[in-house]
Curated annotation (Swiss-Prot):
The gene is leuC2. InterPro entries: Acnase/IPM_dHydase_lsu_aba_1/3, Acoase/IPM_deHydtase_lsu_aba, Aconitase_4Fe-4S_BS, Aconitase_4Fe-4S_dom, HAcnase/IPMdehydase_lsu_prok, Homoacnase/IPMdehydase_lsu, IPM_dehydratase_rel_enz, IPMI_cat. PROSITE patterns: ACONITASE_1, ACONITASE_2. One of its GO terms (biological process) is L-leucine biosynthetic process. GO terms for molecular function: 3-isopropylmalate dehydratase activity; 4 iron, 4 sulfur cluster binding; metal ion binding. Catalyzes the isomerization between 2-isopropylmalate and 3-isopropylmalate, via the formation of 2-isopropylmaleate. This is 3-isopropylmalate dehydratase large subunit 2. Its cofactor is [4Fe-4S] cluster.
Amino acid sequence: MGKTIAEKILSEKSKSDAYAGDIVVAEIDQIALQDGTAPLAIRQLMELGTEVRAADRTHFFVDHAAPSPRRELSNDQKFIYEFAKKVGADFNPPGEGIIHQIMVERYVKPGDLAVGADSHTCTYGGIGAFSTGMGSTDVAVAIALGKNWFRVPESFRVQLDGSLPKGVFAKDVILKLIGDLGVDGATYKALEFHGECAENMTVEERLTIANMAVECGAKAGIFESDENTRKFLAELGREGDFREVKADEDAEYEKEIYMDVSSLVPVVSKPHNVDNVAEISEVEGTEVNQVYIGTCTNGRLSDLEVAARILKGRKVKEGVRLIVVPASRRVYLQALDKGLIRVFVEAGGMVLNPGCGPCVGIHQGILADGEVCISTQNRNFKGRMGNPNAEIFLASPATAAASAVKGYIADPREFL
């Protein structure tokens, strides 16, 4: 019997013939932690008193509170740095960028097994890795031993057919899928993406979709690695890291989902759940106070390019705050070279240093009572951006940029 991508990777890393439902102990290739979760893992390691065997595969990031707005957070960041230096682990200081963007730019390879103390670790499936989030204690064990136990997930085959219409982007595709499945519709499943549209997507588009797999409960979201993946890695100077990762033709899936993307329209996720998805026509005209373009979901160069295309020569509506945050230092420099940063600033926007920015509600753009934000992030839970008395809509960078110009949630198609 053939295997899914999830079964193949977990079989290889556990040196076993594993199928969905099996429990395996697997060697982990890459481990990631951010400043909100790393202190918990480090303290757990200290409590265990165990030797750190996987320091060379462990990467610490300061991205959630970057730069730190409070003394307590500064102390945590110092604590992380000192531990990383002591054990010889990789440390990425404030300003380098978001954990998931840097992991894809520098470290994760197709076919890797990666874990992270962050729920959106599933992002790396966009380059053909099996990657998943874990709690800080489980990640501490991974750092100590270089391995951990996994239950091999059942897989849903998600067939994306057709071509994306004007004004419809990868973000719209994944929001539509989450709206159809519900927030728990794929709990502990691996979403494996196939079909004409998936094959034609750039890696940056795939990363957007993989990033949000967890929002319908999925353990992982995975695309096959192909020539697009090779080109993506080559642009990063990492072509040697490429390997082909594909499911077997006769792999068995728990469920098969078919989506004709040609029929899609721009969508948004309404407050206060990600699966509360509506077509743009249902919410168009809703006034917004803040627009946020960035995050590990949509802070890459192609995201900034489409936003800049809409904003160029236009102004942000009076009374609206536009915040743009590139996902990494590399993306920031690319945006500078292409003149995108100038476009955002001339339009009246604010461009912040690479990091998570307003997404987690620690600093940088906390909403006031009664305010509405449209954001390219991945979650819109009550209080997500620092105020439970505010509302968050999720959308593509194009929809967000169009809304910044209009001052209300707007259809991006009139600008494209």
